[in-house]
Amino acid sequence: SRAGTSGHWFVGDGMVHGLVLGNGAAQSYRNRWVRTEPYVAGLGFGKGAPGGGNSQSNVSVFWHGGKLLSSGEVGFPYELNIADLSTVGAWDYAGALTGSFTAHPKTDPATGRMHAFGYGFTAPFLEYYIIEPDGTMSHRETIATPRSTMIHDFQITETDAIFWDLPVVFDLDLAIQYINDP
């Protein structure tokens, strides 16, 4: 995390690392900051990359639908150039994604479909997505939940997606109060 920002790793900036292997040895290494909107704004480069949410894109990197993507727990995933790890920009699945996107999508090995979800601080608290092997979102469903909880991960079976109802509950009013008066 840059100087003057939180030291908590949940809110740190994302950095990706790439290692090329060949002939039994490392051939090259590189790393790049994921140039999310908050990262670019923090560097004073003016308006950040297009996209929604406040994504640090700091948790996972995955390949699906012909794209290398980086994701955090909130906001959109970010597309990365596989050749040099530069940031292409926020990826919203051709406008189908309007809320947050998990850092832990699951790809069904039998179908190649990627299953994902997004959770938020305001209703709807949970949305479930299915993305086809070509990268198009084919299914988006709101799942009714009584409150906003941190749904860090989930599981899939051949027929179901399983979401955990965990005890970490978000209180938006308390968060706003803390922001205004830490």
Q: Where in this protein do the model-derived segments appear?
A:
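Structural motif
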Residues: D13-M15, F76-L80, A123-Y129, V169-Y178
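Conserved beta-propeller blade repeats
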Residues: A103-K106, T149-D153
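Short coil/turn segments at the loop-to-beta-strand junctions that recur within blades
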Residues: A94-T98, A144-T149
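Well-ordered mid-protein domain cores that form the structural environment of catalytic cofactors
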Residues: V34-H139
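Generic beta-strand structural signal
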Residues: V11, L21, W63, T107-P109, ...
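Short, conserved, GDST-rich strand-edge loop motifs in beta-rich repeat architectures
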Residues: S1-H8, L166-P182
